[in-house]
């Protein structure tokens, strides 16, 4: 019977029942009772921790990239691209009995609602920098050319921000020529 609980996502914490030992009914009722303490088994999602089943998994890592390309009107490269990237890593806890994410308190215990049911949690994404945002970029100055965007504003980034490519196009400035006879 205990294996059914373990297969359902619980883990054995303690027991006064000695597994593998033969027990027989006793007239002393106390000898017929055993205390087995089970708790919900948890899966810790931490792709940076070698002990986590998520270790090294790309499913829990997202990288958001912004590339600013500098081109002439004909599409050829005018200046080296500016690339910025921010990496996000997901963390969470899954209750093996339900297969759902749960919330833990500061002591590592599952937080429950007024009906003693676990409060459903989610993955928490953390950026590899304190303030996840792309920096403002001033377009390079090219002699004889004008950029259609003199700068690209900075923007906040989340794990759900799509990658983006911004194209800055340089147009040749009009030139005056004086012809002398």
What are these regions (language model features)?
Residues 1-27, 107-157:
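Surface-exposed interfaces of beta-sheet-rich extracellular modules
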Residues 72, 93-100, 104-105, 113, ...:
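Acidic/polar residues at beta-strand termini and the immediately following turn/coil
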Residues 74-98:
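Short, ordered, surface-exposed loop/turn motifs in non-cytosolic proteins
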Residues 20-65, 70-71, 154-181:
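Conserved "repeat-terminator" motif of extracellular CCP/Sushi domains
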Residues 68, 76, 119-120:
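A short, flexible low-complexity segment enriched in Lys/Arg and Gly/Pro that occurs
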Residues 11-14, 43-47, 73-79, 145-148, ...:
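Short loop/beta submotifs within extracellular cysteine-rich repeat domains
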Residues 2, 67, 100, 108, ...:
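Conserved beta-strand and immediately adjacent loop positions that scaffold enzyme active sites
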Residues 80, 97, 105, 130-133:
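Acidic, serine/threonine/proline-rich low-complexity intrinsically disordered regions
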């Amino acid at each position: 019977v205990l294996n059914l609980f373990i297969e359902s996502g619980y883990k054995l914490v303690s027991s006064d029942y000695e597994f593998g030992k033969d027990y027989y009914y006793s007239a002393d009722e106390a000898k017929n009772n055993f205390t087995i303490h089970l708790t919900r088994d948890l899966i810790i999602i931490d792709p940076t921790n070698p002990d986590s089943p998520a270790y090294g998994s790309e499913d829990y890592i997202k990288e958001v990239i912004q590339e600013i390309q500098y081109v002439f009107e004909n599409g050829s490269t005018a200046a080296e691209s500016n690339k910025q990237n921010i990496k996000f890593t997901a963390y969470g806890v899954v209750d093996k009995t339900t297969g759902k994410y749960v919330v833990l308190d500061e002591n590592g215990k599952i937080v429950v609602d007024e009906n003693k049911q676990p409060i459903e949690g989610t993955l928490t994404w953390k950026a590899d920098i304190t303030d996840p945002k792309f920096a403002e970029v001033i377009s390079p100055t090219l002699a004889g050319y004008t950029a259609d965007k003199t700068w690209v504003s900075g923007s906040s980034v989340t794990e759900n921000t799509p990658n983006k490519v911004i194209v800055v196009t340089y147009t040749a400035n009009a030139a005056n020529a004086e012809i002398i006879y």
